[in-house]
Amino acid sequence: MCGIVGYIGYREAYPIVIKGLKRLEYRGYDSAGVMLFDGKTMKVAKAKGKVSDLEERALQQITINGTIGIGHTRWATHGVPNDVNSHPHLSNSGDLAIIHNGIIENYAPLKAELINRGYVFQSDTDTEVLVNLIEEVQKKDNLKLGKAVQVALNQVVGAYAIAVFDKKNPNEIVAARLGSPLAIGIGEGEYFIASDASPFIEYTSNAVYLEDGEMANIRLHKSMKVRKIKDDALVNPTIQELQMNLEQIEKGGYDHFMLKEIYEQPSVIKDTYRGRLHANDGLIQMAGVEDNLEKFLNADRIIIVACGTSWHAGLVAEYIFEEFARIPVEVEYASEFRYRNPIINSKDVVIAISQSGETADTMAAIKLAKEKGAFVFGVCNVVGSSISRETHAGAYTHAGPEIGVASTKAFTTQITVLTMIALRLAKAKGTLSHSVFHSYLQELEIIPDKVREALETNDRAKEIAAVFKDAPNCLYLGRGYNFPVALEGALKLKEISYIHAEGYPAAEMKHGPIALIDEQMPVFVIAPKQGHYDKIVSNIQEIKSRSGKIIAVVTKGDTQVRELADYIIEVPETSDALSPLITTIPLQLLSYHIAVMRGCNVDQPRNLAKSVTVE
């Protein structure tokens, strides 16, 4: 949520900041703003809407020169989306400018105290409170910017990633983070600040990811100093070499990032198991698992914590771990887990799943699990993310940057990683026979080919999308391994097309949802030959008898469901446990085409953010 971009160096800042904000659009936002400093004057432009609206506003209102700049895309938390509430915010004196991602929980008493001291507020935001608090600290004790920020942040309760500029000391930007990500790109005679590395990847491959509770004094022509916010202690930061490249974060000829990412799934699944899966040798080697194998094998249970699509991947993993490795599994919404005083101990293994590695609720769940003595294993996509650093060990999905807000390739690569972990544990425990274990390795190795074949359903998905694009409601049904796929299919549709959709276990249809079925209700049924096929056929017959419109995802060559369904989409035959990797593909394509036909913003759906970094 929200995006931060900053630049201090020798180049013109405006194009760097604007391009950077566009690269962060996937994070979700409702307004944008920029501040430029030309050596004398701070020039600010803000606009409700898109970065393109900001560009128009900036050209009308300010001169766009200056080698220092900060920019922001805002996702409203305090105050409605409008120009006034957009960032950057200036202090009362006009000397300080700030951009902020996060929530200041104690902003109300801080604001009241500042009002008592004569401060006047222009916006409804918590961020304006913070910049004036910094100014008050700075004036009261005659402090330099860095020290004033440090003192002020010790009075703040909440989460933040900030960049602060002081025109009285114009060769410096101060950045700090707690609970929200912040990366600093290091170039020759220049620095870049951003919520992630995508805004500066074309300028430098070296970056420092600030840890929670750290701040950086970024000075032009001087080395950067990183300190602890709590006690001002110096920190020696690790400079990382970035793994992504510019090509990965461009559309590459596709109309939308989401479509590109759907079609990347054969290659990224292969990247996920590359070097880990050795089918011919009967081996799975994952360093994070091997180094902590006894922790997994001695666990009384596995607790999976995640949000959104990652939670659905966790549900698939629940079936896989229990069937393959015979370890009890509980799957928890991270947002609920942390607030219900869960019973956790040192015999538990907690697996935290997050594409971005920055999900606030998942981070909080990790910290709680660690406090209670559990071993915590992370499954993330973004290298160097907060969750990857906070967990005891983990595995990256290697899916590459996922820009579309609605996750696609993150889902299938998460399932791939979790399947490999379950297979490795099954081998160690002897809970799968030698032949069954090898058959799964061999099938997993050819899953990219089957995904590629499933992508050939695109034209069929487009035809069906044209029929149901105006449906007000949809129902998704699946059983066993494909119940989470039904949930994920419904989520994708509602996320990007704004059609109300619900996912249910097919057996639960008779316990309520069947009351909704009539000739106006499209029902998407995941019905592969494996698993509970006869049961799902019975469910389809029940829908048919109530005149529901049936769209079924079936195994290639199926005849029984073909006779009952109004529309079918055929996918290649796959074992029950691996079928979610295949059956989810046509549902992704259906959602995509319906959203496009409805004129929706596929990559940046309304009210949604890619990385939910606030609670």
Give the ranges of each region predicted by the language model.
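Active-site phosphate/pyrophosphate-binding segments
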Residues: 265-269, 273-303, 383, 393-522, ...
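Acidic/histidine-rich
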Residues: 156-190, 464, 469-495, 537
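Glycine-rich phosphate-binding loops that contact phosphosugars or nucleotide phosphates
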Residues: 294-439, 443-446, 526-567, 571, ...
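Generic C-terminus detector
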Residues: 258, 549, 562-564, 574-615
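Glycine-rich oxoanion-binding loops at beta->alpha junctions
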Residues: 67, 71-84, 275, 280-293, ...
